[in-house]
Regions:
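N-terminal Rossmann-like or analogous alpha/beta NTP/dinucleotide-binding catalytic cores
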Residues: 1-101
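Active-site cores that bind ATP or allylic diphosphates and position pyrophosphate for catalysis
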Residues: 76-179
Length: 179
């Protein structure tokens, strides 16, 4: 199996403060090992190390209409939740296109997602259909595999996310975990 550390995605909201990105991605890799991921059975890699992620993202962004992006429900909600940041960038708006590239690059036929990610997968399917219509059948149209687990709640009651700064790192002290 493969596990991608999506470090390019972090640039969509942390583009101004990138000094911690390198250490964050290394910490995440160590956390994966500490949580029991066996590197002999699972290949994990950094998204930014595979240049084709960025290349396919660029190609897909050329054929994805802006209204498709602005109608993604998560977009408006995320802007409201992160209103203290300037998210008036293509990087943030185009986050779902980068996600589509992550899926389509590997020609995934099924994708495990939570309910909150269904709109992104629907957009991925639209982008794949448009690409296939323009250039021939290149990408399969991926189907979702819905996870049975509910959203993991962060320290502030919202969905746990590094973007919201509400995570409990695996290497936290017992006092921090208890809080």
């Amino acid at each position: 199996s493969f596990l991608m550390i999506a470090d390019l995605h972090s640039l969509t909201t942390l583009y101004e403060g990138t000094s911690s990105l390198r250490s964050n991605k290394m910490e995440l890799a160590l956390d994966l090992l500490a949580s029991g991921i066996n590197p002999e059975k699972c290949c994990f890699y950094f998204q930014s190390d595979i240049k084709e992620h960025a290349e396919l993202h660029l190609i897909l962004s050329m054929l994805t209409p802006i209204p498709w992006l602005t109608r993604v429900p998560n977009y408006k909600g995320k802007i409201e939740e992160l209103k203290e940041k300037n998210l008036d960038t293509y990087g943030f708006l185009g986050y779902p296109v980068l996600m589509a590239a992550d899926i389509l690059l590997y020609k995934a036929q099924t994708v495990p997602v939570g309910h909150d990610q269904i709109p992104h997968l629907e957009l991925t399917r639209e982008i794949a259909r448009r690409f296939n219509h323009l250039y021939g059948d290149v990408f399969p149209i991926p189907e979702e595999i819905l996870t049975k687990h509910p959203v993991v709640i962060g320290t502030d009651g919202k969905k746990m996310s590094k973007s919201y700064n509400n995570t409990i790192p695996i290497n936290s002290s017992s006092e921090d975990i208890t809080k």
